[in-house]
């Protein structure tokens, strides 16, 4: 009887978990993909910078993060300039692009004290909030695996649209 209960329980669990696993594989927010053109050039420049070492703080994200190089340049210099901070933001990036970049050396051989992550707003036009959260979770997992001593600071996705 105990064996039958275990079999029924395992079958029920499989029926619940399997659709979730299939659904996770169906959306693009978790599938690593590169972009071309200037994006690839910027990605490669990141790899060159981190290869130089001396990285204590890393910012990872999209145009909001990249914006520290434009209008936020003075603030960046004042607060992060002496902190060995590196900006790994690329305008237009979605979770899948950051996943690809992290798999292709953006944080190779560094051990920053903290990684600040803000990504996902560009996914909002084509992914559900749950899918975006899955993409962000993959990024956090990558960082914890590749940078085990680094504190990961996850910032909220800015609200977009009417919903």
Language-model segments: which ranges?
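A short beta-strand-loop structural module common to alpha/beta enzyme folds
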Residues: 82-92
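Alpha-helical cap/lid subdomain in secreted, periplasmic
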Residues: 1, 75-84, 100-163
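A Trp-anchored, charged/polar loop motif used as the substrate-binding/catalytic surface
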Residues: 42-44, 95-105
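N-terminal secretory targeting modules
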Residues: 1-60, 64-78
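Phosphate/oxyanion-binding active-site loops and adjacent basic polyanion-contact surfaces
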Residues: 90-95, 132
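Active-site loop signature of alpha/beta-hydrolase-fold enzymes
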Residues: 66-67, 93, 124, 160
């Amino acid at each position: 009887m105990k064996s039958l209960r275990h079999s029924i329980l395992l079958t029920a669990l499989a029926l619940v978990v399997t659709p979730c696993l299939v659904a996770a594989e169906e959306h693009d927010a978790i599938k690593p993909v590169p972009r071309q053109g200037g994006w690839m050039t910027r990605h490669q420049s990141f790899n060159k910078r981190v290869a130089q070492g001396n990285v204590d703080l890393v910012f990872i994200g999209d145009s909001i993060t990249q914006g520290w190089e434009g209008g936020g340049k003075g603030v960046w210099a004042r607060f992060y300039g002496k902190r060995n901070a590196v900006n790994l933001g690329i305008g237009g990036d979605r979770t899948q692009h950051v996943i690809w970049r992290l798999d292709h050396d953006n944080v190779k051989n560094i051990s920053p004290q903290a990684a600040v992550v803000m990504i996902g707003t560009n996914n909002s036009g084509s992914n559900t909030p749950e899918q975006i959260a899955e993409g962000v979770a993959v990024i956090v997992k990558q960082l914890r695996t590749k940078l085990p001593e680094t504190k990961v600071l996850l910032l909220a996705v800015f609200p977009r649209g009417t919903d």
